[in-house]
Amino acid sequence: MTEDDFRAYVDAFNRADFDGFGRFYADDVVFELGSRKRIEGRENILAFYRQVRAHLDEHIELRGVLIGARNVAMYCRTTFTTLVDWPDYEFGATVKGDVREVETIAWYELDESGKRFTHIRGGRFKP
């Protein structure tokens, strides 16, 4: 994976292009949001993000990216803008118009081809 590849992934994610960012996931990818949530499988991750995107606009602003042979590290700021009330959102109730920002460091493990994510771990540290 090159930095341009990773930036294409983030761009597709920001546009809610599920096919575009989903192509970077291995079929059996594991996604962990700290200790709060674990999702296994590309289709389950995409279903999670479809639900999120029905309620929130999520935009990633890259602050730093490091590319290794089998890993990618990312530091980013993510802005969540609530589009419709979501009282039972698992990360805290939110109402239309709310804007939340968090900073995250994420670690991506790559398959043997170096093209698809097999494990994603994200840890939020701000706020």
Put a short name on every predicted segment:
Residues 1, 46, 50-127:
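A beta-strand edge to alpha-helix "cap/lid" segment located at domain peripheries
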Residues 1-16, 24:
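Short, aromatic-enriched amphipathic alpha-helices that serve as compact interaction elements
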Residues 10, 37, 64-66:
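Structured beta->alpha junctions
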Residues 16-28, 32:
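Short, well-ordered alpha-helical segments enriched in acidic and aromatic residues
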Residues 30-39, 52-55:
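A short gly/proline-enriched turn/hairpin at secondary-structure junctions
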Residues 37-47:
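Short beta-edge strand/loop motif at the mouth of beta-sheet-based domains
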